Amino acid sequence: MTQLASSYDPKSFETDLYEAWEKAGHFKPSGTGEPYTILLPPPNVTGTLHMGHAFQQTLMDALVRYHRMRGYDTLWQVGTDHAGIATEMVVSRNLALEGKGETRDSLGREGFIGKVWEWKQQSGDTIERQMRRLGTSADWSRSTFTMDPQPSAAVNEAFVRWYEQGLIYRGQRLVNWDPVLKTAISDLEVESAEEDGFLWSIAYTLDEGLSYEHVERDADGVETLRETRDYLVVATTRPETLLGDTAVMVHPEDKRYAHLIGKSVVLPLTGRRVPVIADDYVDRAFGTGVVKVTPAHDFNDYEVGVRHSLPMINLFTPVAALNENAPERFQGLDRYAARKAVLAELEDLGILVETKAHKLQVPRGDRTGQVIEPYLTDQWFVKMDDLAKRGLELVEDGSISFVPPNWINTYRHWMNNIQDWCISRQLWWGHRIPAWFDEATGSCYVGRSEEEVRAKHNLGSDVVLNQESDVLETWFSSQLWPFSTLGWPNEQAMAERGFDRYLPSSVLITGFDIIFFWVARMIMATDNLVGKIPFKDVYFTGLIRDGQGQKMSKSKGNVLDPLDIIDGITIDDLVAKRTGGLMQPKMVEKIEKATRKEFPDGIAAHGADALRFTIAALATHGRDIKFDMNRAEGYKNFCNKLWNASRFALMNTEGAAFTGVPRPRTDAERWILARLAATTAEAQGHFAAYRFDLLAQCLYEFAWNAFCDWFLELSKPALNGADAADAESTRHTLLYVLEALLRLLHPLTPFITEQLWQQLAPRLGLAETTLSLRPYPTAAEFEGDFAQAEADVEWLKAVISAVRRVRSELNVAPSKLVPLRLQAGLEQDRVRIERFSASLSFLLKLDSIQWLAEGESAPPAAAAIVGELKLLVPLEGLVDLDAERVRLDKEIARVEAEKEKSETKLAKFTDKVPPAVVEQERVRLADWNTQLAGLREQRAKL
């Protein structure tokens, strides 16, 4: 075994340790014990590891390692998603950069898909390599790609079954259409933002010589206009769509227009007659109370159109130019050119009543930035009503638990307002829909293969069948992830991969932003297709933001690459990474300036453990999580402190060979074992509640404060003392507690704990070859009758802290011996002083400890109070009296402030506060009063 390095350098061992773990097969399921399964939300195969991935994967890995150490049969199922649209865009962009003139369309379907597979082979494992660097202990031999044969077979099976159940149908519906990508996209891929626009008011002439009395009133209800009109005024932000209007509507209870319901208006620029209909959707108080209805180009109008059986006129081509349904003079115009032409004609006709500035929500595709068009096309859909009803039941009856539970309300709202799901996409990369059309008749057949279709429907070789060209949207295959990865529907594969053993999984860790698009659909699909729940718990994480609370994005130039935090990056490389390939070149200078200001020296290497511990510490149950680099620096220091503490332990136990549980001889040993038992119980509770932030906090406090700051100090008198038995016992306890601490920390910080444990294990006679196979600590391992020792050592700590504070404030050199005089106090204080005199003398550098006799005057001294006990450090030869007066005044002010806080807290307590809490605060207040009296008395003497 090589000697532990003198300084903490994570780069020197993290990669080697990971390779050793993986080579030894430690990440594979053991096949014994209770199963514990986690599904990785499959990242896009196009992607690289970002902070959101690192955040979720750290928490998943902590749970997997924790349960593996507890003897569970752990399976962490990983893989990647084919990411239809994103992948097509990346490959198309790469083709353009190659400069060979090849495009998606010039290559054709098969040629382009071949290029996609080539690209996938080159870069598809990038994100998995990055996950390894983070320390994820997944079973890589089971890694699955959603386009692999097995999950592809599952996709076909699910489609066919749902089609046969009547859940999948083909029909015309409105979808979100991206005119650049020329495909439908999901709601998740649409980003709406407020933009400046216009609201145009247009006169629609009433048919058949109809008229009505139009009245306008001001805010006070005073009539300002009364006239007879033979036209209705409608307002729109999209005047070009009036060419596709099939009605105008009013509220059924609007008396102004009651006699016009069922009549017609003449549609401007077309001469078509469209009806005046009544619908509750209309807001009578907005504008004139008359609304145009364009069912093929507005989602709300579509619903109105369905209710009233209105014609649906699609005006646009797939690239958002006007098609043959528009008047000939507008055909072929881009939608924005058509808008200008329509407005010009309306103005020439004198029926453009008003134009005014208007704020409106504009939906844009998240990948192209283009305005999304509500578009009427033939698409494949899944009927959602019955699936959603069952999906909601499984959460509301507790079969599946949400953490935090408030997300149930969001889930319920969506499930109660669900729409049929458009599952087809006009792409080439993805799972091609298993449907075939008869070239002669247009009849559609669905089956697992063309051969199955022909056999089932008795179609001879003379019948020409063409497969549907559309592919399924990515979420269709993703919803099958819980069971397609376990071999479904192939029975042999299901048996080999442990379908019955590992489904349902134990917990899903994912972002709340895909609760509808993925979580809900997995619940519905798993229940319907295999009769199980997909997972028992869902833990929703917040979204990672930068230190100022801003969303991390390439365009903002504030993205942090987790690998840069782990391995470090120079400032020039960081600037290049943040500014390269920006869609808005004008942002380059601004981003470079901000980056150089925030990271003047680049980002130092922190190691994987420091990043992982930072993530755990930040993992609150809130919606947003601010990532603060200062926290990462702090936890790097934590790792460094743990390293140095381990070096201390190893240097003081050279040649040691212990076995079993130590039998503590000193109070310091008993105290640290009691703290260890309490910390272990607390840690297990936090794991069970998914409170990673509190877990990190309690382990940090034990490691830094209890173990490093106090136990190592308190062990020094025994290690350096004359009592050989005390020294030997302390050495055993030192190693024993450190080994337990490494086990406690291992799920969060696997690398440093493994590296240190390898040095420690031989001295404790441990048989395991790796820390990852050691059992996670239980509180019962460390419990004992240590209550008195705990109280005694807490008193000792208070005395040491008080005297050290005095020495520090007096600027007494650390090596200088000083006397300590004691006054007042209880009998218990005298017993403890006697008991701990050697430790006090050693740790406080005291040349003498003496009690003042009752009634004896105290010399001029710096004073501190612990309970009833007054601690006096005589000032003669140490300090001038003026400085001590200043010090005492500051100490009195501090204690007065604490006393006031305690009094305020007691005054605010209500009847609902537990009596024990009230009593605890009263005791605290009494202690402050005692300290204050002693300090004032000492000040009076000076």
Curated annotation (Swiss-Prot):
Gene3D superfamilies: HUPs (3.40.50.620), Isoleucyl-tRNA Synthetase, Domain 1 (1.10.730.10), Valyl-tRNA synthetase, C-terminal domain (1.10.287.380), Valyl/Leucyl/Isoleucyl-tRNA synthetase, editing domain (3.90.740.10)
CDD domains for the chain: Anticodon_Ia_Val (cd07962), ValRS_core (cd00817)
Reaction catalyzed: tRNA(Val) + L-valine + ATP = L-valyl-tRNA(Val) + AMP + diphosphate
Motif window: 'HIGH' region: 43-53
Short motif ('KMSKS' region): ranges: 551-555
Any one biological process term the GO annotation gives: valyl-tRNA aminoacylation
EC numbers on record: 6.1.1.9
Keyword Ligase: yes
Keyword Signal: no
Molecular function in Gene Ontology: aminoacyl-tRNA deacylase activity; ATP binding; valine-tRNA ligase activity
Cellular component aspect of the GO annotation: cytosol
Broad class of the protein's primary localization: cytoplasm
Subcellular location as annotated: Cytoplasm
Coiled-coil blocks: 876-942
SUPFAM superfamilies cross-referenced by the UniProt entry: Anticodon-binding domain of a subclass of class I aminoacyl-tRNA synthetases, Nucleotidylyl transferase, tRNA-binding arm, ValRS/IleRS/LeuRS editing domain
Function text: Catalyzes the attachment of valine to tRNA(Val). As ValRS can inadvertently accommodate and process structurally similar amino acids such as threonine, to avoid such errors, it has a 'posttransfer' editing activity that hydrolyzes mischarged Thr-tRNA(Val) in a tRNA-dependent manner.
Domain notes: ValRS has two distinct active sites: one for aminoacylation and one for editing. The misactivated threonine is translocated from the active site to the editing site. The C-terminal coiled-coil domain is crucial for aminoacylation activity.
Family matches, as PANTHER family: VALINE--TRNA LIGASE, CHLOROPLASTIC_MITOCHONDRIAL 2, VALYL-TRNA SYNTHETASES
Protein name per its UniProtKB record: Valine--tRNA ligase
